[in-house]
UniProtKB/Swiss-Prot annotation:
This is Probable G-protein coupled receptor 152. GO terms for biological process: G protein-coupled receptor signaling pathway. Residues 325-335, 348-414 have a biased composition (Polar residues). GO terms for cellular component: plasma membrane. GO terms for molecular function: G protein-coupled receptor activity; identical protein binding. Residues 415-425 have a biased composition (Low complexity). It comes from Homo sapiens (Human).
Length: 470
């Protein structure tokens, strides 16, 4: 605004704006910043959680009408609180706008879309409840099933179209010396656009107020005659809570808008009413912050869903703690390997039948030597190495059958039928002692074939899978 236009408007008693003429008289300060920051820190996560809960409920098909309403309302409140971040930035700079014209237009457009969508959505909800209360027999049968989806989509489209002027007219310009402010309308188009803003906001609010009063009066008159279903009572309780809070906290802003339009060209009254608009806008922010908590208090389904989500999250956190995890499987594998057994015996033992594993004597395993195992204790040899039991009995049949076979029958009862049921290792090793002229050479400890017969290298790879019963 140049000085010539300002002088002409000052001479006629009209001014383009009535907010501020001096940087020192800026009414908003530190307490406003603290209040707005507290609302943002409380309201943004709450509305985000409400949108996620309502989206999950609508995705699973539970309470679709209420879920779509709460999802749209939570998104509207979230955007309205996000637009307040620009207001905090402006307050911190003492009314100076440091972001330029593009950010100024985006700020007013975001504010207009979020404010109009919430207002139109609650007006449609109030009208729907009023028709349901006044025509309880006719309206439910004639209402389309997809009406909530159509209403929510139409509300967002209408709010976007209604906020298009805020993408065109706002501008960041020098107002007082080097003070740059973000103005929504200038003098030439302010009156017409202010009237559009007031009518576009006041008429839906008036429809909401009238329908809400009629619905509450009808509900009080018919509540003693008939009992509603639990789902209808829950939806009515949530809608009543939201609409009542909206009427109480947004009515001052609508009244301040009407008075501001009436005294638009009055300097002092316009300035006071501008301050009234600013602080009544804080009430709208408070309503957007409290709306998720009011919905949770009024809806039992949302409280149950929130408790289940929080309990699942707490259980996941407890599982991720280092002290709560005990690796049971690796400990079982370490115990089953047996540190005192040689490596080929451990492989053969892991492939045996679990029925024969508990019969191994753990006290005799550390003393068993693979090279001198037949001399230490021939009777305990089938227990320490069940895979080599058929070979010892076949190769040393003339000398050790009379001693080792009865003891193997009395001490070890289960491996005997297991060895007889798998004849493949015994049948393959049976021609070997018949080819040697001296079968007693196996009892000599200095002979290399005896040590090779018990050593890991003499065990064929194909004999390990057939060592135990399958």
């Amino acid at each position: 605004m140049d000085t010539t236009m300002e002088a002409d408007l000052g001479a006629t008693g009209h001014r383009p704006r009535t907010e501020l003429d001096d940087e020192d008289s800026y009414p908003q300060g530190g307490w406003d910043t603290v209040f707005l920051v507290a609302l943002l820190l409380l309201g943004l996560p709450a509305n985000g959680l409400m949108a996620w809960l309502a989206g999950s409920q609508a995705r699973h098909g539970a309470g679709t009408r209420l879920a779509l309403l709460l999802l749209s309302l939570a998104l509207s409140d979230f955007l309205f609180l996000a637009a307040a971040a620009f207001q905090i930035l402006e307050i911190r700079h003492g009314g100076h706008w440091p972001l330029g014209t593009a950010a100024c237009r985006f700020y007013y457009f975001l504010w207009g879309v979020s404010y109009s969508s919430g207002l139109f959505l609650l007006a449609a909800l109030s009208l729907d409840r009023c028709l349901l209360a006044l025509c309880p027999h006719w309206y439910p049968g004639h209402r389309p099933v997809r009406l909530p989806l159509w209403v929510c989509a139409g509300v967002w489209v209408l709010a976007t179209l209604f906020s298009v002027p805020w993408l065109v007219f706002p501008e960041a310009a020098v107002w007082w010396y080097d003070l740059v402010i973000c103005l929504d309308f200038w003098d030439s188009e302010e009156l017409s656009l202010r009237m559009l803003e007031v009518l576009g906001g006041f008429l839906p609010f008036l429809l909401l107020l009238v329908c809400h009063v009629l619905t509450q009066a009808t509900a009080c008159r018919t509540c003693h005659r008939q009992q509603q279903p639990a789902a209808c009572r829950g939806f009515a309780r949530v809608a009543r809570t939201i609409l009542s809070a909206y009427v109480v906290l947004r009515l001052p802003y609508q009244l301040a808008q009407l008075l501001y339009l009436a005294f638009l060209w009055d300097v002092y009254s316009g300035y006071l009413l501008w301050e009234a608009l600013v602080y009544s806008d804080y009430l709208i922010l408070l309503n957007s912050c409290l709306s998720p908590f009011l919905c949770l208090m009024a809806s039992a389904d949302l409280r149950t869903l929130l408790r289940s989500v929080l309990s699942s999250f707490a259980a996941a956190l407890c599982e991720e703690r280092p002290g709560s995890f005990t690796p049971t499987e690796p400990q079982t594998q370490l115990d089953s390997e047996g540190p005192t057994l040689p490596e080929p015996m451990a492989e053969a033992q892991s492939q045996m039948d679990p029925v024969a594993q508990p019969q191994v004597n753990p006290t005799l395993q550390p003393r068993s030597d693979p090279t001198a195992q037949p001399q230490l204790n021939p009777t305990a040899q089938p227990q320490s190495d069940p895979t080599a039991q058929p070979q010892l009995n076949l190769m040393a049949q003339p000398q050790s059958d009379s001693v080792a076979q009865p003891q193997a029958d009395t001490n070890v009862q289960t491996p005997a039928p297991a060895a007889s049921s798998v004849p493949s290792p015994c049948d393959e090793a049976s021609p070997t002692p018949s080819s040697h002229p001296t079968p007693g050479a196996l009892e000599d400890p200095a002979t290399p074939p005896a040590s090779e017969g018990e050593s890991p290298s003499s065990t064929p790879p194909e004999a390990a899978p057939g060592a135990g019963p399958t």
